[in-house]
């Protein structure tokens, strides 16, 4: 692909704005700012030990998880990049207990940005792919946001995406009109369109789950995974392979490219906590992307994007990916009720 004929993220968004007329200028600018912040995060991730950013920060986030230095740095990069542009009313992050209103000395816009600044951060120190996940909502209260403003079901998202910081740095985006992937050209500093209208195969022979928790699973998940593990001689009549990176962005990106099902179920260890992944800035944006690519995403009993949030850091079980497999494991949950 010659440099002259490449489609950059900026060009793609401008063309989408012109052709479909469903991408407001403020939303286009917001997406570009988020993508620019992801470039800065990618740069800091790639420096590794040379950047003195590895290891823990000696603090915990609101979930009680030990924060890595890069967790905090990535969060600050996203806040600093987005607070002054006039596109947002407020932001919320995995790393902050409450939402972040745009300071009074900056203009405010009509959108809300929710993000996990560095997903899979347990992999930072061992050089495994990690990433950033984000979701964009309209602020129902105009430009004056409250925590309640964020508590919208995923069906209200106007954009969602993620970046993967791996062998290549990629930026995957949906604005409700398909899913497209952009690769960072480090020589010129641009996001370049490399995959258009991504589609997840409806059937798959791969699944992603943390099998070390098998003894804690509820019966529907155990039944489903046991059938997969039984292979060609089992009820499915086929051999399946398990893949688990322990980085949601990396696992979902693989599924987006070649199919599969990603599962992070609730289990018996914490019956009062329905799952581990956060609805607002992990499950919802990934569900939006997966559905736009022809896949499905449920909690096991309900479409993820139809869950009514009750808090910024609410957790849900997650089953997403190839449509036929997600529908099968969801059916097993309904049968057990």
UniProtKB/Swiss-Prot annotation:
Mg(2+) 2 binds at residues 116, 119, 282. Its cofactor is Mg(2+). It comes from the Bacteria. Substrate binds at residues 119-122, 210, 276. Keywords: Carbohydrate metabolism, Cytoplasm, Hydrolase, Magnesium, Metal-binding. Pfam families: FBPase (PF00316), FBPase_C (PF18913). One of its GO terms (biological process) is fructose 1,6-bisphosphate metabolic process. InterPro entries: FBPase_C_dom, FBPase_class-1, FBPase_N, FBPtase. Its EC number is 3.1.3.11. GO terms for molecular function: fructose 1,6-bisphosphate 1-phosphatase activity; magnesium ion binding. Binds 2 magnesium ions per subunit. Pathway: Carbohydrate biosynthesis; gluconeogenesis. It is an enzyme of class 3 (hydrolase). GO terms for cellular component: cytosol. Its main location: cytoplasm. It is found in: Cytoplasm. It catalyses: beta-D-fructose 1,6-bisphosphate + H2O = beta-D-fructose 6-phosphate + phosphate. Homotetramer. NCBIfam families: PRK09293.1-1, PRK09293.1-3, PRK09293.1-4. Belongs to the FBPase class 1 family. This is Fructose-1,6-bisphosphatase class 1. It comes from Burkholderia multivorans (strain ATCC 17616 / 249).
């Amino acid at each position: 692909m010659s440099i002259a004929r490449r489609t950059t993220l900026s060009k793609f968004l401008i063309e989408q704005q012109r052709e479909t007329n469903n991408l407001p200028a403020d939303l286009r600018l917001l997406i570009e700012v988020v993508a620019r912040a992801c470039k800065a995060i990618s740069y800091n991730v790639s420096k590794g030990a040379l950047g003195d950013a590895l290891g823990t920060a000696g603090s915990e986030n609101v979930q009680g998880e030990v924060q890595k230095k890069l967790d905090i740095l990535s969060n600050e990069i996203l806040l600093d990049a987005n607070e002054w542009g006039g596109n947002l009313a407020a932001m919320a992050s995995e790393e902050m207990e409450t939402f972040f209103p745009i300071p009074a000395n900056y203009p405010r816009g009509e959108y809300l940005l929710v993000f996990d600044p560095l997903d899979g951060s347990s992999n930072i120190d061992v050089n495994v792919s990690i990433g950033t996940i984000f979701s964009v909502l309209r602020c129902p209260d105009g430009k004056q946001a409250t925590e309640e403003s964020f508590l919208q079901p995923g069906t209200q998202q106007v954009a969602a995406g993620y970046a993967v910081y791996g062998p290549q740095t990629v930026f995957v985006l949906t604005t409700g009109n398909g899913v497209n992937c952009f690769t960072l050209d480090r020589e010129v500093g641009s996001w370049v369109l490399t995959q258009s209208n991504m589609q997840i195969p409806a059937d798959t022979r791969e699944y992603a789950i943390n099998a070390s928790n098998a003894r804690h699973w509820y019966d529907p998940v155990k039944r489903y995974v046991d059938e997969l593990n039984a292979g060609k001689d089992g009820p499915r009549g086929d051999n399946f392979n398990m893949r688990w990176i322990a980085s949601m962005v990396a696992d979902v990106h693989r599924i987006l490219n070649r199919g599969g099902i990603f599962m992070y179920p609730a289990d018996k260890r914490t019956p009062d906590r329905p799952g581990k992944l956060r609805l607002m800035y992990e499950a919802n944006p990934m569900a939006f992307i997966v559905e736009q690519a022809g896949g499905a995403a449920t909690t096991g009993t309900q479409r993820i994007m139809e869950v009514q949030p009750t808090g910024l850091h609410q957790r849900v079980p997650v089953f997403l990916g190839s449509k036929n497999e997600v529908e099968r494991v969801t059916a097993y949950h309904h049968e057990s009720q």
